[in-house]
Design a protein with these regions (language model features):
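Short, contiguous alpha-helical
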Residues: 6-21, 25-76, 119-165
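Acidic/histidine-rich alpha-helical segments that form the ligand environment
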Residues: 78-118, 126-142
Length: 165
């Protein structure tokens, strides 16, 4: 399982890096433009992916590691509201999160261990591996939304191919 999760985490890092290269070419107004998606804009969707990675993987799941990683900077940024950061700061946080997620996969001793994960109104009892797969795939889903927005804006993009790693 570790090999699969490491591959997926490295893929997310690769895809995020390539997505950021495209997003850095856009005007800030294009990043913030309301395009009618659930999280309103490219930047809103980008922030949502980062929030989930920090809160769930680097927050809750990290607490299940034998030696939890130091994610204080990311947790502090999340607590103060990622939307309050400029784009350059968000890029730094994204890159830091991607590195730590790979380190977290390496630090987990037992991916089959079942843990409860609760949110207001719902809770799950799943293996740590399933939580990892769910959140890593969550990023893929929302990067696909960003790619579709870029397509509609006629901005060339191709940051999602795992075989290109």
């Amino acid at each position: 399982m570790r090999e699969v999760l490491t591959l997926q985490a490295r893929y997310n890092q690769f895809a995020n890096d390539n997505m950021l290269k495209v997003l850095e070419t856009l005007n800030p107004s294009d990043l913030q433009k309301d395009v009618g998606v659930y999280y309103t804009s490219i930047i809103g969707t980008f922030i949502h992916i980062l929030e989930a990675d920090i809160a769930i993987l680097l927050g809750i799941i990290n607490s299940y590691a034998p030696n939890p990683l130091d994610t204080k900077d990311l947790q502090d940024a999340l607590a103060s509201g990622l939307q309050n950061n400029n784009f350059e700061s968000l890029i730094t946080l994204r890159k830091q999160a991607d590195r730590l997620i790979i380190d977290l996969v390496d630090s987990i001793a037992d991916f089959s261990a079942v843990r409860e994960l609760s949110f207001p109104g719902i809770s799950f009892k799943k293996s740590i591996a399933q939580y990892f797969l769910s959140i890593l795939n969550h990023g893929t889903h929302h990067r696909g939304q960003i790619a579709a927005i870029l397509d509609i804006m006629n901005v060339p993009n191709d940051f999602a191919g795992m075989l290109g790693m």
